[in-house]
Amino acid sequence: MQLIDGKAISELVKQEIAAEVAGIVAKGGKRPHLAAILVGHDGGSETYVAAKVKACEVCGFKSSLIRYEADVTEEELLAKVRELNEDADVDGFIVQLPLPKHISEQKVIETIDYRKDVDGFHPINVGRMSIGLPCYVSATPNGILELLKRYHIETQGKKCVVLGRSNIVGKPMASLMMQKAYPGDATVTVCHSRSKDLVKECQEADIIIAALGQPNFVKAEMVKEGAVVIDVGTTRVPDATKKSGFKLTGDVKFDEVAPKCSYITPVPGGVGPMTIVSLMKNTLLAGKKAIYK
């Protein structure tokens, strides 16, 4: 069993980005600039945004954090999005999800200029990704592809089961694992809460990508010997022994599943750090105008 160390790989990628940015700046070019909008005080969102700002620092990017209270109106938020669309200094920006109930996430996503949509959530980026055109690929699936690549994990002709069908992970992940490229060329099955033979599908899978948000859902009896298991779940489970009062728990029952795997990602320290690094990669592409002029 080999542990896929997302933390170590993410540090490596950040150093690669920082070196490229240093080269751009040395030639008189502009530092990539990422802006983030944070609404309210959701614990998970606070943690993620802080990590994104810190990653920008390491990569040599300029970053801006724009904060609103949870009672901000949809109109006020959309006005800020339009302002960032027009701001030539901002290369890419994100609106941290989830948003309060009174704001339509879809409306916000569609208002973002797709050329600055470094989260890869805009329908234009999603559509381009699904037909294999250059675009900003959403961060978590992109991070998983990077891990498969860096560990030289074989995907061609492999049976890959994606657990979960969210727009953020499940659907794009299935599309990417089917693409005519490496990593890809896999035979993909998507399972979800309504699937009938989920356990049987998992037992036959060479690669399982678990993105359900259900702690410890994948158990040893669901995984065949030598499988590759990628755990996208990060649920905060109360834990009195931890200073924060909770521990991050994946969708995979790690201790019992790991011995059967050829490769497995831990939680934390697996997919999470790669998600942030993918956002940095997209921001660098935006700064270089590599995808959209």
UniProtKB/Swiss-Prot annotation:
GO cellular component: cytosol
InterPro entries noted in UniProt: Aminoacid_DH-like_N_sf, NAD(P)-bd_dom_sf, THF_DH/CycHdrlase, THF_DH/CycHdrlase_cat_dom, THF_DH/CycHdrlase_CS, THF_DH/CycHdrlase_NAD-bd_dom
Keywords noted in UniProt: Amino-acid biosynthesis, Histidine biosynthesis, Hydrolase, Methionine biosynthesis, Multifunctional enzyme, NADP, One-carbon metabolism, Oxidoreductase, Purine biosynthesis
Pfam families, per database record: THF_DHG_CYH, THF_DHG_CYH_C
Domain of life: Bacteria
GO MF annotation: an example: methylenetetrahydrofolate dehydrogenase (NADP+) activity
List of residues binding NADP(+): G164, R165, S166, S193, T234
Coiled-coil ranges (or none): none
Catalytic activity field: (6R)-5,10-methylene-5,6,7,8-tetrahydrofolate + NADP(+) = (6R)-5,10-methenyltetrahydrofolate + NADPH; (6R)-5,10-methenyltetrahydrofolate + H2O = (6R)-10-formyltetrahydrofolate + H(+)
EC nos: 1.5.1.5, 3.5.4.9
Family to which the UniProt record says this protein belongs: Belongs to the tetrahydrofolate dehydrogenase/cyclohydrolase family.
Function: Catalyzes the oxidation of 5,10-methylenetetrahydrofolate to 5,10-methenyltetrahydrofolate and then the hydrolysis of 5,10-methenyltetrahydrofolate to 10-formyltetrahydrofolate.
Protein's UniProt name: Bifunctional protein FolD
Native source species: Phocaeicola vulgatus (strain ATCC 8482 / DSM 1447 / JCM 5826 / CCUG 4940 / NBRC 14291 / NCTC 11154)
Lineage: Bacteria, Pseudomonadati, Bacteroidota, Bacteroidia, Bacteroidales
Gene name, Swiss-Prot/TrEMBL: folD
